[in-house]
């Protein structure tokens, strides 16, 4: 696009030509005017010759004009303010003195020092000037056509009558004159000569601007001098002087050049000065120099340095202006922005926003009419206004150059669009009110205060929304719609209620604790009862963390309760606190906070005793709790250690008891420290998403690691990390201790030996010292998070109820496995009563589990294969850890009690059967026996219980599959922890069990208040936090309650029925979820009668627990209850085998669309790594390949590898790398291969890594030799279903049935 020529182009003399294309003309030194003139044509017209005046650097495309100009040109051109009607010729002459003219001459004046800097700027500016011509000045340039490339000729005429709002000011002792400074020019950069160069020049301009900022520091000094000079110079004269100046500076072209820079054609010298001053003033502001906001027109002159064009406001005395440095280019940029801040033309300062270096059409808007600053005082005032915020702004924008954008806000007070512009971020608003609200985001002002909790908001609307939260609890209190000055928050009142508050700050304090439970950074001096929960709290006491507390009031009390629980000090007092803390108000009497007067007391002692009497009164409850709320910093470390374990329960507490006085005092002292976000870390100020995340985050500061591995002693900050870590021990140590006696915990590597050992117990040959019923749970809870009891297993039994409650299901399994070995190693027996009954129950449970496992295996051999853990594996494991698993497995609750009850319900009848099932290794021959067991199972007593004859048995059955899975896991077969539906691997069985609930839609933990179902106890506990503690029925906290999974040992027997119910309800779901699915499903396959029996048995059991009543949808087959018809419908498919959703690729069918979607991901290899659940692990194939004890390596290398030869090499090679890399096929994929005889399956189906299905047949044979029932049944299944559909689908069905 052709560049539009300036009306009065002025050659830019700069050692560094921003635009190489410009060639010599621009490079010419000030003295090279003649040469420049020769080369000029290149730079300006491109096609025309350009003559450059060596004195003023003015460019002329016509020789005649150039000669005429030389006659009148002087080294010190007067300032010329060009009005639109001004004669073109004069402007041309004066523009010549463009700031770029000769830096050397500038040296003549006092500005000499400044001249150096200005010289550079001047050079830059000319470049911009040239660029500007291209862009055309947005402002009043007569060359409005600039947007369209105008022919070179038109520009020339422009010289004659540049109506551009360019003001030329003579710079004393310099040739520098203001050059046109349009934004376009800036954009064009130094493309003075070549239009194409303009764009490239932008970066250069930006760099120069940065340099100019530094130069401006020097300019500021000059500006000060200029100010004084201007003040001395005729302020009134400016205009007159300007007019005279205009006459001498008749060259209108110069103004055209200047318009960009001077954007504000100063009708009066003072205005010009103001503009100029504003330019430098901005820099001053940035630099922290005093803003040149002085109303004096002279003040504006300081801008002169910024804009040569406006160098001397008093045109009459151009000399004073002369000091303005040539740096004008940048200063101009900055000055424009500044002027933008000034009401007039610069108002378009929006261009300033662009100014940062982007060519902003607005920049050129230095409107060409002096009208912009008709009154110098006005412009000065505008400049001053702009500068005031600038200094502050610069502080905020540390790294950002003082781009004009900063000044934009007031740029054009006259321009309605820019009237409401933010001076900090240049955003434009439609109204002043909107702007004022926006400014609060910069200032942090929050004038509207909630009169209930003390939270502050930037707008009344936000306050209204927030206030709705209090309507229910405080319907009688009206919102205070009026702003409350924040400083009043620090002013104590006789009532103890801060200004603008209708209630004492007690609740807010609680909230504060809530929000910052981990680090009660509140100074110990505050005397808040809440113990500095963070060990390092004492260190932080002075830190703003305390303020967060004050802010916390904004947060709901529940959070505060959490905080209380978090506070270490509360740990030992926790129970007491819960009572007292239920409602801080109740404790304190709410109003008592008015005692706040004592709040003024520093309570620096931070000890309850030291607290003021009023504080003590409120503190007393805390002390009663036994937690010195105001624990001194010395106590903090201990507290931190304690609180970690307490977090889960602390959440239930409504709030901590704190003295009203201390609370109020804390509020007062910490108001200034308030944090904007309730979930903000008081130490590093990081904002977390929620309280729980904040709690965990604080551990990074405190170094707290509340979750310790009982095996290796490693500690972790989160329970999840600990669970994941447990997998490390399961993978290998379990290999050494595959089987443990459920009674004496003795370890056996051979399942058969274990069975014999159990028989010895049964025969009385070995003393029965069974693990306490609650041992497993206790272990789980211990592993879960009780640090205090970590050392003593005995305490776990007691703590089990609470601790296990939270994540019973989750941690139990993980903790249980490692826990057993720990106990055995430790040699410490759980203190729970080792009643003979419990031991017998444990033994019977184990036997029953074995039987049920065998029967289940027989019933669903195929299923077992698919389930990812061979039944045989389970069997072997069953004997070893079936009981243990049952115990731990039992829905993370009185599993033992169930086992005992089940034992009573169905005494050892299953023992014989259980004995039949032998370790997988031995099982090869026995597998056939196992199959018979299927038929026998229904008849055998064990079968009946398994079918559900006894709820306890049902639970056992469920547990058995889990235990089997667990055992397989212990063996080191990770596949048991891989979801058979979606292939996601999990670190432990408990995690897998919980995960299966996402497929089965089972939500065994039901809130007694709202009947909402939760998949885990932890989720239920979190949900309970949504209910106020008062609302929760006392029985909720009874271990035997719906939360029963955490029942204590003593109550195990007494609560056997409810427990069993739980187990059955939860356990069945769990068993099914595991995909062992046979336990109950097996019963289903068996005569329906037994199931129905189970159902009836469950019915009475289910009735008692209040949580069961809400579930109205009961499964007729297994008695499970569901909260919705859809969940029941999905569940019923596990009994009917219906799988309406089929995979179009491999033919596998699924019970839910969600499962199908997940499965589809298995066909997309590229996506596998993307999702955690899609990870392929070499171990996964083991589970799928068979339940028997065969190692995957054996199966794969011998069977599959041998078969690989039968497959097309390309088929095998495709996936060889994946397998070797550890990307084992997914369970589903492996099962597909195992299904055997489906060589045609696409590689993508997941048959991938394994040899073709055809090769699997022989592999299957070997598997059979390994006596894996799953494999045996697999053959049958394959023969039966191969013709109709891919074998994978058949297996999937089985698996689905088991899982769902």
UniProtKB/Swiss-Prot annotation:
Residues 277-319, 329-352, 543-561, 889-910 have a biased composition (Low complexity). Residues 87-100, 145-157 have a biased composition (Pro residues). Residues 577-586 have a biased composition (Polar residues). Coiled coil: none annotated. Gene3D superfamilies: Classic Zinc Finger (3.30.160.60). Keywords: DNA-binding, Metal-binding, Nucleus, Phosphoprotein, Repeat, Transcription, Transcription regulation, Zinc, Zinc-finger. One of its GO terms (cellular component) is nucleus. The modification Phosphoserine is found at residues 109, 919, 1177. Residues 1-11 have a biased composition (Basic residues). Widely expressed in adult with highest levels in heart. Expressed in fetal brain (in neurons of hippocampus, cortex, mediodorsal and ventrolateral thalamic nuclei, putamen, cerebellum and brainstem). It comes from the Eukaryota. Its main location: nucleus. InterPro entries: Sal_C2H2-zinc-finger, Znf_C2H2_sf, Znf_C2H2_type. Residues 122-132 have a biased composition (Basic and acidic residues). One of its GO terms (molecular function) is zinc ion binding. Disulfide bonds: none annotated. One of its GO terms (biological process) is regulation of transcription by RNA polymerase II. Belongs to the sal C2H2-type zinc-finger protein family. PANTHER family: SAL-LIKE PROTEIN, SAL-LIKE PROTEIN 3. Probable transcription factor. This is Sal-like protein 3. It comes from Homo sapiens. The gene is SALL3.
